[in-house]
Regions:
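Structural motif
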Residues: 81-82, 131-133
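Conserved small/polar residues in nucleotide/adenosyl-binding loops
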Residues: 1-4, 186-193
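Short helix-loop-beta junction
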Residues: 13-16, 92-109
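Conserved thiamine diphosphate
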Residues: 2-82, 91
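Generic long, charged, amphipathic alpha-helical segments
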Residues: 107-126
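Glycine-rich, acidic loop regions that bind phosphate or pyrophosphate groups
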Residues: 147-176, 180-181
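Short beta-strand segments
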Residues: 48-50, 85, 135-136, 170
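Short, solvent-exposed amphipathic alpha-helical segments in soluble enzyme
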Residues: 5-9, 36-41, 61-66, 95-102, ...
Length: 196
């Protein structure tokens, strides 16, 4: 018996279940809110929470969008790109956006709280700039990034809007050896370097 579950496969598998809602809180306060919401719904609901606790970044710069399904923050004035992400990796995206902003590249970060289903039509007015990055720690095939990119691009093309350059950055289809988070990240980075 070898442990293989890294939390990278669950979204892809769970989102294939008809009628499911999936939440990905990134703080203890949001975890409580998500659990309360899950209990109040008369539907199948999954709440995922990463091991390792609450990631550290400045949440005060984020404001609610799309009702309460997501939050957004602009790092700099007139963002030239939008990053959509969720969960623990939001901290990494926020730190990267701070660094880019300090160098003159403004970025909008959108963090999904409810990661499936996502209302692509409601997200359209929140997109900024000429590029869209969908960033997740999950498996790419069937993941939030892949599904949301398809929905957003379809909605934009039907509406006749500008279609941004779009990149889904997720774990390519492979098994990741079991280990703590830093070991897993190191393994993935090494594999990506060999693949490029």
């Amino acid at each position: 018996y070898k442990r293989q579950h890294q939390g990278i496969y669950d979204v892809s598998m769970l989102s294939s279940i008809p009628g499911i809602s999936i939440y990905s809180p990134d703080s203890f306060a949001e975890l409580r809110e998500s659990l309360d919401e899950a209990v109040s719904l008369d539907a199948l609901t999954a709440v995922r929470y990463p091991r390792g606790g609450e990631p550290e970044y400045d949440r005060s710069v984020y404001h609610p969008i799309c009702g309460d399904a997501a939050v957004a923050a602009d790092y700099g004035v007139a963002p030239c790109l939008t990053v959509i992400t969720y969960g623990r990796i939001t901290a990494e995206a926020s730190h990267a956006a701070e660094a880019l902003s300090a160098r003159g590249t403004a970025v909008r970060i959108i963090r999904l709280k409810k990661i499936y289903p996502v209302d692509a039509q409601a997200l359209l007015p929140e997109l900024r700039g000429e590029a869209l990055y969908l960033l997740e720690e999950g498996i790419e095939s069937g993941g939030v990034g892949e599904k949301l990119a398809a929905a957003l691009l379809t909605a934009l093309s039907v509406r006749g809007g500008r279609v941004p350059r779009t990149v889904v950055h997720a774990v390519h289809d492979r098994f990741v050896p079991h280990g703590d988070v830093p070991v897993s990240y190191t393994h993935l980075r090494a594999h990506e370097t060999r693949s490029n």
